[in-house]
């Protein structure tokens, strides 16, 4: 069995925002999402077997590429999520929700739908192993009057959706 130390997620908008903020090229930043798995152990053969299993599992489920990333670079990108979003938009709404882990893809799709509907960029990072989803809704150059009108509408739809999945608001950390 594999017991990852953590399982993190970043959507493509969050990846590209971190990449611009850090001024560092990240792998496959032009498409897709990141699922960041950290494993640990003191037996190289066991770790190699776990990596092969993870590769097969991810590839079977549609991963573009599975790679052993530079841990410093990939964690720097993940940890910069909030700061990168603040650099992109001083005004934003940081939503902290938690849903069953199996519902994370539905939440990601719903957030993309809501972003398109309301004309805002939403960047997503998640602690995927416990269902905690952070969504930063960026105001950017939207007029303040419009922002103050659309944000509550978007939040109402998001919160209703989260509750419909059995989720909760203020997720730190997890209902898994």
PLM regions and their residue ranges:
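Noncatalytic alpha-helical scaffold of FAD-dependent oxidoreductases
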Residues: 1-176
């Amino acid at each position: 069995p594999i017991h990852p130390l953590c399982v993190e997620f970043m959507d493509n908008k969050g990846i590209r925002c971190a990449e611009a903020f850090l001024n560092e090229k990240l792998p496959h930043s032009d498409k897709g999402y990141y699922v960041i798995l950290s494993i640990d152990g003191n037996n190289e053969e066991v770790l190699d077997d776990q990596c092969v299993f993870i590769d097969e599992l991810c590839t079977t489920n549609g991963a573009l590429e599975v790679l052993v990333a530079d841990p410093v670079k990939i964690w720097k990108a993940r940890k910069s999520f909030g700061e990168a979003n603040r650099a992109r938009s001083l005004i934003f709404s940081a939503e902290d929700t938690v849903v069953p882990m199996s519902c994370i893809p539905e939440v990601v799709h719903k957030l993309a739908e809501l972003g398109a509907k309301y004309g805002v960029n939403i960047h997503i990072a998640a602690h995927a192993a416990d269902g905690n989803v952070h969504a930063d809704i960026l105001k950017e150059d939207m007029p303040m009057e419009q922002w103050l009108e659309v944000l509550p509408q978007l939040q109402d739809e998001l919160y209703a959706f989260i509750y419909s999945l059995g989720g909760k608001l203020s997720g730190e950390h997890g209902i898994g």
